[in-house]
Amino acid sequence: MTHSRTALVLIHPATTTRPELLTAAKQHSSLSGANIEQHLVNKLNDGSLQLQDNSYDVIFYVTPEAADEILFPRRLIGVLAAALRAGGSLHGLYDKYQVDALLSGFDIVREPTYHWQKRAVTASAPVKLAPRQPVSAAGLPRFKRASAPSPAAVTPTLDEVPPAAVDPVKAALLDSAAGDAPIAENDLVVGHDSTPITLLTCGRTQTRRRKACKDCTCGLREENEKEISDTHARQEKLLLGDAVKFSEPELAEIDFTIEGKKVGGCGSCSLGDAFRCSGCPYLGLPAFKPGQPINLSAISDDL
């Protein structure tokens, strides 16, 4: 039974500026003698137009765009492939969408005119499998059971050795009661230890002395710490011995609290001045309150 050829013409909206393109497409040899349906491609893109599968023999896309500048929705290529019958052709799209065409089941045909042709679906014939033949016991492979490995020879222990086979001298050494006696730790100390002792050389006196180890237990660390503390004590004693001491006239010169004295030793700053001259002995210190005792020990290091 033969069916009438059906063709679909999809029109780009810009084709209205060049109507001769639509006229030339309808006169194409692939559309001769076919029932032509024409729709705007926008309706197919927005879903308002639904195409039935295997309904068209030819689909023609008309657009004023150049072949390498055509902008066509790629998802519609699969829709057009489903709407074509096996062996049907699609005209108007070019190599820019060649990969999409191959993935959608088209073959690229370049002669006599460029178009895509839908591949025919090859029917797969079922293959009849031969029934599986029962396998007899005689046909099964035979395997030889490996012999169990012989146990390894076990060396008898001293308790299992007969008394006649034991050397009496060795037995006396092994069974000696002295072997179980505790050993004094002093007996384990080597008389001449080959480990050298770390000695430090003083840069001033050129004398050498031992350095205490990290986990010292012989008292050398305590001895070193005591020597260091004694050295610090002597240094502090020497420093304190050179502390500045003021005589009575010197204290009177700088002391603001002396009764009847209103200015300091500089002769210009009074007791309560917050800003002092460059020669004032209390330059940089806050103003003193009247009657407040002045302690000079806090600034003895600076003086």
From Swiss-Prot:
Residues 126-188 are annotated as: Linker. Residues 266-280 are annotated as: Fe-S binding site B. [4Fe-4S] cluster binds at residues 266, 269, 277, 280. A motif (Cx2C motif 2) lies at residues 277-280. This is Fe-S cluster assembly protein DRE2. GO terms for molecular function: 2 iron, 2 sulfur cluster binding; 4 iron, 4 sulfur cluster binding; electron transfer activity; metal ion binding. Monomer. Interacts with TAH18. Interacts with MIA40. It is found in: Cytoplasm; Mitochondrion intermembrane space. Its main location: cytoplasm. A motif (Cx2C motif 1) lies at residues 266-269. GO terms for cellular component: cytoplasm; cytosolic [4Fe-4S] assembly targeting complex; mitochondrial intermembrane space. Component of the cytosolic iron-sulfur (Fe-S) protein assembly (CIA) machinery required for the maturation of extramitochondrial Fe-S proteins. Part of an electron transfer chain functioning in an early step of cytosolic Fe-S biogenesis, facilitating the de novo assembly of a [4Fe-4S] cluster on the scaffold complex CFD1-NBP35. Electrons are transferred to DRE2 from NADPH via the FAD- and FMN-containing protein TAH18. It comes from Eremothecium gossypii (strain ATCC 10895 / CBS 109.51 / FGSC 9923 / NRRL Y-1056) (Yeast). Its cofactor is [2Fe-2S] cluster; [4Fe-4S] cluster.
